[in-house]
Amino acid sequence: RGFTRLTKEIWQFEAPFDIRFRDLMAHTVRHLMKCGFNVVYGYSESDEISLLLRRDDDTFKRKTRKIISVLAGEASAAFSVAHGQTAAFDARVCVLPNEKLVVDYFRWRHEDSYRNALNAHCYWMLRKKGDSVSRATEAVSGLTRAQKHDLLFEHNINFNELPAWQKRGFGVYFQTALKEGFNPKTDETVQVKRQILHTDFELPLGDDYGVFVLERIV
């Protein structure tokens, strides 16, 4: 809540993107995926987090108000403790009736991240050159996507070469990993499978991302 003011004016993170803030958000997503809900995929762009729960998740008997309050509280606590300063998250629940709408939702978020990143880089480039808030906002709002790319390129910024996480956000999901264990019955070292959280800063694009999300639905 109020993250734009907090990040740019009070905490003074680098604009438009700061890897320190990204890592705080990644920490928060990982916490939410281990705090008691059956979350199979977490996605974050900017200061927003989207969680995909298992179809059969019955945490708090699926009571929407309870889910919202607990997840918002967990996110707020995890971020605040990691950062050392207070932050507050709100939350909402979207109940989607089929797999297509789930995929569409995450693809929309993916595309929204791209649009926001392009606008943010243009806006903050102009601000750092000395433009006022109103002048920079007006200048960016009247440009097409291609013109925004050109504007950045004129100032030695190739948007296509910027880090993927800035343009498309990042995902967190479970992967199976082999780890070395010990079998006391046979007195042998064995390989065991474990589910570990993986943070992916290079998500696939377009239709490939749709397939990726579909594979996470269980």
State what each model feature region is:
Residues 1-218:
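Regulatory and interdomain segments flanking nucleotide-handling catalytic cores
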